[in-house]
């Protein structure tokens, strides 16, 4: 029996990626789509490559009162929008919120699926991690869990593709001329993902992340996040790699690599790649994490979380290879 799925915020990049994954999922049936800027359009008008079975599905204006009977709802709304939008969704509808409003909110599981899958299984409300937390925490979690690095002296330098800024419109600041051949730091000292990263570092380590520094940069590529973390610790490169291999043993989506990871490796997938370089004499550990910001950083992890809460195989609908080149 199919699981009846809806997506709110389908007009954007995150919602569109969720639609792509749901469309080919063996247990999901997309029966409802909502998008503020595209209400009244057919799905094929917004996404010309949509499967024929979904082409004529009409995108509706979001109204939880008129929802059809759903089993599962994906929400991909801007920060600040999903808390109000989802407040009146019936309690028996499972929700995975790709947006940021419900991370570490009471009643919502934090959906870092490769680290705490057991805490997600069977839950009704799950908050997806952000794209930068997905990349950084995938690499940091094994080291923090085994106390190989100090939690309060971590410096994160992250690069993200333009799609991480959202789809935008005609007046978007992220058009080709503004973003090609330039690198832009942003959100210095106050990026919205910084509290989420700090709280999870503290949860993993039991220590303080008060000294956390996080600087993201927008780079001229479509997809991808590369996070490089500079940490204090006496572990060797081999010890870091071994810790990650133990931590992720049996996990399907995190790949531990001896080589520095590249964003291309993850494009179009739910994979995370992590690697390490360390110099014990300098008390230095460099951790690296790569994800597709729309995959593991958004819709891919959302589907992984949905599989967990619906009692499905965790890899269902997510076993495709990354796109290369």
From Swiss-Prot:
Pathway note: Amino-acid biosynthesis; L-arginine biosynthesis; N(2)-acetyl-L-ornithine from L-glutamate: step 3/4
Reaction(s) this enzyme catalyzes, per UniProt: N-acetyl-L-glutamate 5-semialdehyde + phosphate + NADP(+) = N-acetyl-L-glutamyl 5-phosphate + NADPH + H(+)
GO molecular function, one term: NAD binding
Active site: 131
Entry's Gene Ontology BP terms: L-arginine biosynthetic process
One Gene Ontology cellular component: cytoplasm
Record's protein name: N-acetyl-gamma-glutamyl-phosphate reductase
Record organism: Methylobacterium sp. (strain 4-46)
Gene behind the chain: argC
């Amino acid at each position: 029996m199919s699981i009846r799925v809806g997506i709110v915020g389908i007009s954007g990049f995150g919602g569109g990626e969720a639609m792509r994954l749901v469309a080919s999922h063996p247990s999901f049936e997309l029966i409802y789509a909502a998008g503020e800027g595209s209400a009244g359009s057919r799905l094929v008008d917004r996404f010309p490559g949509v499967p024929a079975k979904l082409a004529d599905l009409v995108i509706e204006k979001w109204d939880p009162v008129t929802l059809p009977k759903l089993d599962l709802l994906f929400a991909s709304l801007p920060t600040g929008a999903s808390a109000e939008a989802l407040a009146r969704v019936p309690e028996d509808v499972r929700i995975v919120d790709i947006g940021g409003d419900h991370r570490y909110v009471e009643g919502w599981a934090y959906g870092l699926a490769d680290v705490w899958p057991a805490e997600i299984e069977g839950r009704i409300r799950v908050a997806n991690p952000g794209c930068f937390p997905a990349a950084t925490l995938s690499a940091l979690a094994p080291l923090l869990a085994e106390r190989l690095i100090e939690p309060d002296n971590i410096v994160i330098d992250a690069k993200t593709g333009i799609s991480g800024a959202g789809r935008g419109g005609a007046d978007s600041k992220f058009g080709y001329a503004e973003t090609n051949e330039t690198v832009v730091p942003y959100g210095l000292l106050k990026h919205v993902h910084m509290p989420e990263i700090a709280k999870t570092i503290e949860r993993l380590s039991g220590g303080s992340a008060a000294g956390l520094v996080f600087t993201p940069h927008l780079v001229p590529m479509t997809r991808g996040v590369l996070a490089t973390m500079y940490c204090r610790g006496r572990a060797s490169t081999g010890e870091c790699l071994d810790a990650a291999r133990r931590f992720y043993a049996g996990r399907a989506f995190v790949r531990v690599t001896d080589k520095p990871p590249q964003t291309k490796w993850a494009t179009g997938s739910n994979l995370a790649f992590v690697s390490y370089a360390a110099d014990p004499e300098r008390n230095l550990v460099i951790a690296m994490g790569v994800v597709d910001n729309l995959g593991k950083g958004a819709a891919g992890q959302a589907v992984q979380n949905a599989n967990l809460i619906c009692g499905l195989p965790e890899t269902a609908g997510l076993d495709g290879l990354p796109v290369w080149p």
